[in-house]
Amino acid sequence: MRLLIDTHVLIWLMVGSPKLTKRCIKLLRDEGCEVFFSAASLWEVALKHERKPDKIPVAAEQVERYCRECGIRQVPVRFEHALKTCELEKIHADPFDRMLVSQALVDGMKLVSHDEDVIAYGDAVIAV
């Protein structure tokens, strides 16, 4: 299975947050799964870390380095992803989350998320 990690899950993984569920850890460690992160997540971290470093305790460069060292592969933002965001149901207004859902759908992945608004997108998402 191909898994795309939601931004908050990726940050929790990096900082060893107790919010990270056992189910999530087991899923991400499963050898049968390929794990990916989105370039959109780096952009989101860069913007939010600059504005609220107390809420986003890591910089985009740290996230990218962590992913590279852990073998988590990057998914670039492509034209098809942007178009898919326009087709999504208007469940959630956050543009970063909508992009991640779109990437998961277009690229045949499952988005790993703890965000209730994202989980509402159904089959494209694995709730953790």
Locate predicted features:
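Generic structural signal for small/hydrophobic residues in well-ordered secondary structure
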Residues: 7-8, 45, 85, 104
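Active-site neighborhoods of divalent-metal-dependent phosphate/nucleic-acid chemistry enzymes
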Residues: 56-61, 68-116, 128
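Active-site regions of enzymes building and remodeling cell-envelope glycoconjugates
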Residues: 122-128
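Phosphate- and divalent-cation-binding pockets in alpha/beta enzyme and binding domains
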Residues: 44, 84-87, 120-121
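Residue-level signal for well-ordered alpha-helical positions
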Residues: 16-17, 48, 88, 124
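Short, well-structured N-terminal submotif of metal-dependent ribonuclease cores
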Residues: 1-37, 50-65, 69, 107, ...
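A broad detector of the eukaryotic-type serine/threonine protein kinase catalytic domain
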Residues: 29, 47-50, 87-90
